[in-house]
């Protein structure tokens, strides 16, 4: 709620089957907060995550709530964190069918992609209308600080942003983004949305939560 009050544009939750990031009850709470504030609520997860004792399955979680956006990631159930995007051969007829169902009630159905993805025509065929670029490798390059590698990494992101836009896709980016690498990412073209996660917690220990949120908002929107 404090994030919304301070001016963030939306909230994202990644409810994994092991519940280590979020519980189903958290989704209901976030859903209500975003709905009241007219802010975007994004639910992230693997389309094929099945139900268990305490986890109703990803599809059920989405259908039981009111997200503005769903971001589909190829994470295995026990995977520590998202570390790669979808491969084109994974986007089969079952995937397409579920995307079609989601789009009846959800503004954006997005998929997690690597920075060398190229099959954007396939995404249009499936019905995907948004992508999230996995920026883990990009963040590592910026952290290393080698100018020629930074330039190369920015070119990769710029090309994928341009290709996605040519295919009328909303472009998001996320993973390991922070105050140090966001300025470099902003030079890579018209990215519509970024997701900031762990870095907010880390920076809050130094600057406090309110100042941290304000710093990110200023960095992103300046």
Predicted regions mapped to residue ranges:
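Histidine/lysine/aspartate-rich catalytic loop segments that bind and position anionic ligands
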Residues: 110-156, 160-163
């Amino acid at each position: 709620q404090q994030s919304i009050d301070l001016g963030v544009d939306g909230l994202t939750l990644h409810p994994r089957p092991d519940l280590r990031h979020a519980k189903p009850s958290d989704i209901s709470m976030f859903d209500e907060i975003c709905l009241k504030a007219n802010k975007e609520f994004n639910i992230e997860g693997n389309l094929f995550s099945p139900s268990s004792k305490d986890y109703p399955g990803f599809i059920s979680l989405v259908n039981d709530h009111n997200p503005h956006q769903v971001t589909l990631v190829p994470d295995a159930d026990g995977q520590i964190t998202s570390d790669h995007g979808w491969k084109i051969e994974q986007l089969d007829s079952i995937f397409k069918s579920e995307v079609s169902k989601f789009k009846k009630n959800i503004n954006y159905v997005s998929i997690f992609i690597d920075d060398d993805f190229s099959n954007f025509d396939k995404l249009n065929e499936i019905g995907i209308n948004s992508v999230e670029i996995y920026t883990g490798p990009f963040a590592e390059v910026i952290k290393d600080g080698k100018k020629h590698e930074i330039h190369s990494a920015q070119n990769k992101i710029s090309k994928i942003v341009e290709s996605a836009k040519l295919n009328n896709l909303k472009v998001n980016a996320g993973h390991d983004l922070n105050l140090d690498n966001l300025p470099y990412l902003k030079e890579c073209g018209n990215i519509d949305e970024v997701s900031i996660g762990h870095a907010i917690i880390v920076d809050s220990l130094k600057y406090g939560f309110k100042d941290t949120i304000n710093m990110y908002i200023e960095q992103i929107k300046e």
